């Protein structure tokens, strides 16, 4: 029988696991534009590094979610944290080799992408197992609150990662310049500490309770705050026997999924290109861009979380109205970001766009959920999570590809797409 103190300790440790996986990824994302420029690799290669990682995450996450019940949740958490640490260590080693000129910049970045493949393949094993442990140790009445609090770790990670990344840049150690590779090494070290704590403190669940399981989480990325869909999927796990399977083409949810996919791509496009925009609009050297980039990303993440945690709960908005409001705000914010020329205007415009996306993400999640009955909630939640993840597979590469053609283009295209989607949503979105 677990004591209350033991339960609280285990929950705090699981919270740190989720926070670390999200924070480490977004910290690396925030420094990659500067790293790419310093290694003289194309901007599109930087985006590709995260696109392939996100693709593997989308593919592998459901597989690990199913296996967590058979192989033990603790084992899956250890696998996920191990993949996280190895990935960052590999990335740090090859980035350091490129920074010091031991290998060419292109070779360093190809090896860096291989490290990102490890993260996408194995890092996604931990979040479903964390959910399953929490779900298995709470009553149904307590579960939603506990999983929601756990899910907030991903949101906090999107703030903390870019915020602390500039302070993790290291100098020369033993004659080797670490520089911009510092965040990779330090997050790998922190992840190792978390892995050891999990191994020592979490109980070994060799005979897991198969009545509850976790659900695949969307790829933790800049701008990719949790939609809550994986929480719904996890809380519906004990009614699987009565579950109704819903197809992507089901007319009840298809308009909502389209709205989520298009708005998600807009968010991914603008978020991935923002580091390059800061460097070029402010005419900064790569190393000088870390702090202003971190400021812009932090303000954007705070704006989105303020909407999701503070504004939406106090407004009586239905999903359709929430989507329309969000699209209008996001369209204006994206266009202004593309035209901004100073740190202040970039930060304010990007924050405005983030406010808009802070409305659209939960709007499409809630709209799809309300479009079906109780027994279809788990199926719909899985599809919502897949759509969220899919946006971060192609979105970053599309955004940076447009940026290479013309710096304002990803923001103007995203703004135009949000306005077109506004028209579609006005006509097609219906609530049950």
What do these predicted ranges mean?
Residues 60-73, 306-319, 403:
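Helix-to-loop junctions at the C-terminal end of transmembrane segments
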Residues 19, 101-125, 345-359:
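Hydrophobic core of transmembrane alpha-helices in multi-pass small-molecule transporters
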Residues 125-138, 359-373:
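Intracellular juxtamembrane helix-capping segments at the cytosolic ends
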């Amino acid at each position: 029988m677990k004591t209350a103190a033991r339960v609280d300790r285990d929950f705090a440790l699981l919270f740190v696991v989720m926070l670390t996986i999200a924070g480490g990824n977004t910290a690396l994302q925030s420094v990659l534009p500067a790293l790419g420029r310093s290694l003289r690799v194309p901007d599109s290669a930087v985006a590709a590094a995260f696109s392939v990682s996100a693709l593997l995450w989308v593919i592998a996450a459901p597989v690990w979610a199913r296996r967590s019940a058979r192989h033990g949740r603790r084992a899956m958490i250890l696998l996920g944290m191990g993949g996280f640490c190895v990935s960052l260590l590999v990335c740090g080693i090859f980035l350091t080799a490129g920074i010091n000129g031991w290998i060419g910049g292109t070779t360093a970045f190809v090896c860096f992408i291989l490290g990102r493949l490890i993260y996408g393949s194995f890092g996604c094993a931990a979040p479903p197992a964390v959910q399953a442990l929490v779900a298995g140790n709470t009553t149904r009445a307590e579960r939603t609150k506990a999983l929601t609090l756990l899910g907030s770790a991903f949101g906090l990670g999107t703030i903390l990662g870019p915020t602390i990344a500039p302070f993790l840049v290291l100098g020369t150690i033993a004659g080797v310049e670490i520089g911009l590779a510092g965040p990779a090494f330090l997050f790998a070290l922190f992840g190792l500490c978390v892995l050891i704590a999990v191994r020592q403190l979490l109980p070994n669940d060799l005979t897991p309770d198969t009545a509850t399981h976790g659900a695949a989480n969307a790829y933790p990325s800049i701008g990719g705050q949790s939609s809550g869909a994986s929480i719904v999927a996890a809380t519906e796990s004990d009614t699987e026997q009565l579950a109704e399977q819903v197809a992507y083409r089901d007319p009840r949810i298809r308009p909502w999924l389209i709205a989520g996919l298009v708005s998600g791509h807009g968010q991914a496009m603008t978020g991935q290109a923002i580091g390059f925009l800061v460097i070029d609009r402010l005419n900064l050297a790569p190393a000088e861009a870390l702090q202003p980039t971190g400021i812009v990303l932090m303000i954007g993440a705070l704006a989105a979380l303020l909407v999701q945690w503070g504004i939406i709960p106090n407004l009586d908005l239905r999903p359709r109205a929430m989507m329309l409001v969000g699209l209008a705000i996001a369209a204006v914010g994206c266009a202004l970001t593309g035209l901004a020329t100073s740190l202040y205007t970039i930060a304010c415009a990007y924050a405005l766009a983030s406010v808009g996306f802070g409305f659209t993400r939960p709007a499409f999640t809630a709209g799809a959920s309300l479009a079906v009955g109780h027994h279809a909630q788990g199926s719909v939640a899985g599809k919502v999570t897949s759509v969220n993840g899919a946006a971060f597979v192609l979105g970053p590469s599309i955004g940076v590809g447009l940026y290479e053609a013309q710096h304002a283009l990803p923001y103007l295209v995203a703004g135009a797409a949000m306005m077109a989607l506004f028209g579609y949503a006005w006509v097609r979105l219906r609530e049950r």
